Amino acid sequence: MSDLVAKTAIDRRLADIVTPVIEGMGFELVRLRLMSGKTRTLQIMADRPDGGIVVDECAEISTAVSAALDVEDPIEENYTLEVSSPGIDRPLTRLKDFDVWTGYEARIETTELIDGRRRFKGELAGTEGDEVLITIEDGRDGYVTIGLKFDWLADAKLILTEELIAEMLRQKKASGNFDESQFDEIEESEGEEADEAEQPPTKH
């Protein structure tokens, strides 16, 4: 089964290199993208298994990943490395994410039309086999829970809600890395990737 961590061939190759490094430090790779542009940017999202990664930890990951990439040298052009947390309205890139975030609202986009639509918004209801379950509004019956095969997904992301913010606060307090000032203006940033811990870019 595929995942949404790394989509393209070069992304998957890079993920194969950096995943052991990140996991060896006690973190998880959430998403990796090599972005095009005048200078290419390697964007890495990482997190603790129980959530709550902070800027200093992103910096540690950046240093370790840089060293590994310097040895393997998979990117021929100059590039900038960015390591960040997934943010509050985080992407859902692995099948297990849909179990972890059961009960929270999400937006899902599929690669092909499913019953005439590609976009689904609703409450996550876990997984069943290789299917993601989501409860969506149904004009006739109120609400209905449908199953979408994980391999059909093009993108999936949590929706910023008060319940989600409360859970992120709980995770940060539990991790011992809680800084209340980071959450002062979250409600004003609804719909954006608020509270994203990010290490300043590193050029290569």
Curated annotation (Swiss-Prot):
InterPro entries xrefs: Ribosome_maturation_RimP, RimP_C, RimP_C_sf, RimP_N, RimP_N_sf
Query: What biological function has been recorded for the protein in this entry?
Result: Required for maturation of 30S ribosomal subunits.
- Segments for region (Disordered): 176-204
Q: Corresponding gene?
A: rimP
Q: Would the keyword Ubl conjugation turn up in this protein's UniProt record?
A: no
Main localisation, per the record? cytoplasm
Family listed: Belongs to the RimP family.
Annotated keywords = Cytoplasm, Ribosome biogenesis
Q: What is this protein called?
A: Ribosome maturation factor RimP
In this chain, composition skew of type Acidic residues spans 181-198
Listed GO CC annotations:
cytosol
Q: Which processes are annotated in GO (biological process)?
A: ribosomal small subunit assembly; translation
- The answer to whether keyword Cytoplasm applies is yes
Q: Where in the cell is it found?
A: Cytoplasm
